Amino acid sequence: MSFTLLSSPLQGFTDFRFRNALNNQFGGIDTFYAPYIRLNGKFIIKNAYQRDLLPENNSGLEVIPQIITNDADEFLFVANYVQQLGYKELNWNLGCPYPMVTKCGMGSGLINDSQKINEILKKVHAESDILVSMKMRLGYENSDEIIKSLPILDTFPLKNIAIHARIGKQLYKGGVDLEGFQKCIDTTKHTLYYNGDITSVAKFREMQERFPTINHWMIGRGLIADPFLPSMIKNNTLEYPENKIALFIEFHNTLYQQYSESLSGATHILLKMYHLWEYFSLSFSD
């Protein structure tokens, strides 16, 4: 069965430098979702967002921009901006679990407000021809939230819905709710992408067997912890390359060089790399 692998957007990690380094060194990812754009009521696209989406910074990559918002006018503003850059799709983040987002009624904190979701999508589809896709969790407090919102989403021509099979208040703790994801499959007509705890080839195979109708798989933290994972899944192998260490060092050095050139000061650079090292360390026993 053919399938696609997608890189889940992770703030502070999967920027264009990471995307390019991973694609050039390892490959395996079909589509990269860019970390979300957040306007905070100001209709200005920050320079960091601009750099991340510039076509010249994403040459040879399939990239989908993402927005996090609870306001239709913000959505339309960003939709117009990314269309000017040549993008045809905008992903709407209803998945972010962090309190600083959810307390503002955004990310997974918006899933239980079906009326607001309906109002935003209705206005966006009336005033823009951009293709809309969704990135969601099962809810914030419980997995019934998404089940209540899916009938609303079914009334719109969404490209797909990528679902991280946790609720927001879990953050990344505890296990994924596979029964909750199955209920989504049974409830919606939309194409669903699975996201959550794909951290090894064995785990991917397990999920494929569990959800045989799913052909699109999104990898988040597992991709940062093990950048070899997508290509190993695609090649259907459990074996790492013989030159694993050399390949990883080249990947690491590419990232370090690029962040050294773009960030100011040793402290800033080391902090950036430290967060990456926290994930990288999971793939090495020593």
What is each model feature region?
Residues M1-D286:
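Flavin-dependent oxidoreductase catalytic cores
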